[in-house]
Amino acid sequence: MALTPTDVSRIALLARLELSEAEQSAMLSQLNGFFDIVERMRAVDTTGVAPLYTPLSAVQEVALRLREDAVTEVDQRQANQLSAPAVEAGLYLVPKVIE
């Protein structure tokens, strides 16, 4: 997946970035380099390879320090929402920012 200068301009616009021509060119090169790496990784056959939860588990035995998933804090949503400018049905209301 190769990006074009138009793609970089669009991404910069969406990210509210003002890039010079030189910066756009450098960004295009960096992004295309990233996507090249992703494509090479996709090409690797990983059939039969178990996923690692940590890279260390490939070279040594790793004991996971798991704990019970238990609630340790009390629900303070209502107290936290008292200072919010707008709340509805327990949700924070924010202004629309998508054009």
Curated annotation (Swiss-Prot):
SUPFAM superfamilies the UniProt entry points to: Glu-tRNAGln amidotransferase C subunit
GO molecular function: asparaginyl-tRNA synthase (glutamine-hydrolyzing) activity; ATP binding; glutaminyl-tRNA synthase (glutamine-hydrolyzing) activity
Record-linked InterPro entries: Asp/Glu-ADT_sf_sub_c, GatC
Enzyme Commission number(s) of this protein: 6.3.5.-
Pfam families, per the entry: GatC
Cell membrane among keywords: no
Any one Gene Ontology BP term: translation
Catalytic activity: L-glutamyl-tRNA(Gln) + L-glutamine + ATP + H2O = L-glutaminyl-tRNA(Gln) + L-glutamate + ADP + phosphate + H(+); L-aspartyl-tRNA(Asn) + L-glutamine + ATP + H2O = L-asparaginyl-tRNA(Asn) + L-glutamate + ADP + phosphate + 2 H(+)
UniProt keyword annotations, A-Z: ATP-binding, Ligase, Nucleotide-binding, Protein biosynthesis
Family per similarity comment: Belongs to the GatC family.
Protein role: Allows the formation of correctly charged Asn-tRNA(Asn) or Gln-tRNA(Gln) through the transamidation of misacylated Asp-tRNA(Asn) or Glu-tRNA(Gln) in organisms which lack either or both of asparaginyl-tRNA or glutaminyl-tRNA synthetases. The reaction takes place in the presence of glutamine and ATP through an activated phospho-Asp-tRNA(Asn) or phospho-Glu-tRNA(Gln).
Complexes and interactors: Heterotrimer of A, B and C subunits.
UniProt protein name: Aspartyl/glutamyl-tRNA(Asn/Gln) amidotransferase subunit C
Gene field: gatC
